[in-house]
Amino acid sequence: AWQFAELQMTAQANGWAKFVSMQNHYNLVYREEEREMNPYCLSTGVDLTPWSPLARGILAGSYQGGFGGGSTDRSKGQDRQRTEGLYHGDHVFPIAERVIEIAAKYEKTPAQIAVAWLLHKPGVASPVVGVSKVSQLEQLVAAVEIQIADEDVSYLEELYRPVDNLLSIGFS
């Protein structure tokens, strides 16, 4: 966050246009941005446009039971290795299972619940989603209308564990 703040100050000092949005990595299983970047952006009026809101399919239910349980061509193919490098930790699949549980409660898809959670967070303007079908995009757009109860938000969030070593994560 300090580097982004430095860029903002440099832009201001030189009369340049400042950044108005931050495209950061943020979802239910990767919430490191809550430490510094999100609060900085919120306090300075910079909108968040998080990428990977579905954690490369994990939060959409594509890997039920673990990485070996891939249910899509992408989750069974070479992308699986990238996903494993980016999302690891004992909290990942239990959180994904809670997303599935809450989705059933609201009669929505897990992907819709993951995006609705993100849209519930302060400062999030719009997540950057990736889809392979028009129907998936339509479902995710419909997530704008979903209101998740505070107790369900807490239930989704309570298993998260911060990453001990940020250098240990992979790249998307």
Regions found by a protein language model. Give the residues of each.
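Aromatic-lined glycan-binding groove of carbohydrate-active enzymes
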Residues: E32-S75, T109
